[in-house]
Amino acid sequence: MSLIARIALALLLAVVQVPAAFALDDAPASVVQELVPFSSDEGLARLARSDAKVDFPVLANQFEAESNGAFCGPTSAAIVLNAVRGRSPDLPRDHSRLHPEDLQYIPSAYDPALPRFTQDNVISKGQKTRAQVLGEPMTINGKKIQDFGYQARQLDEMLRANGLTTRLTIVDDSKSEQDIRTELIENLKRRGDYVIISYLRKAVGQQGGGHISPLGAYDALSDSFLVLDVNPTSAGWVWMPTATLVKGMRTFDTVENRGYILIETH
């Protein structure tokens, strides 16, 4: 094999082995309906006229960005958990972001860590470990594989382990676009109920692999949902047409399709 051929093969293998959760994926995204940035005039107008946006102010108040490319699931979980149970006196205190030197001048009786869920402390309640989220091989269907991030069903289990009542929907061919639209709109019109979606970025016209984020609102005039993307480094909040969103969820992830999780508090 020539030197040029060996270099080409090495580059090909390097691309193939990049985990989906971290891949930037510069390949052309599939052709889909246009995504409208939330920060645009049109994006703000859609929120203003929406009649399915009661979740938005609560989620926006609790919003945080993921700290790494595999934590979109835990970050979405933390945002929703704080929206549901924020200011409860029994919330966990995450000390992982405080270093010993940070505490040297703080009175010993005072705990500076705020009582709230974080993308770090929500993981420990679920079956999937932090190491597995970050690529430690795990057994799935009898095979040892790396499974970065969270599949929809794994995230649903973690949310339940943290005390939420959920309903998982896997978006396969049996689930119609109209049924999905109706369920999501009904949830977004009820206070205290939330939606987390799992979708493939490439399928919705963005660069990247699988991703998870909450939904914030629905605009009937444009038939689009507001995706509160937890990775602003890759993409900001966008209005995503229903057909595009369904296309992104109706994609395969390891053992089954992606989908959405309805968090029910009533």
Region roles according to the model:
Residues 263-266:
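Short beta-strand-to-coil "C-cap" segments at the C-terminal boundary of structured domains/repeats
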Residues 1-2:
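N-terminal secretory signal peptides that target proteins for export/translocation
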Residues 21-148:
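Active-site-adjacent structural segments surrounding the nucleophilic cysteine of cysteine proteases
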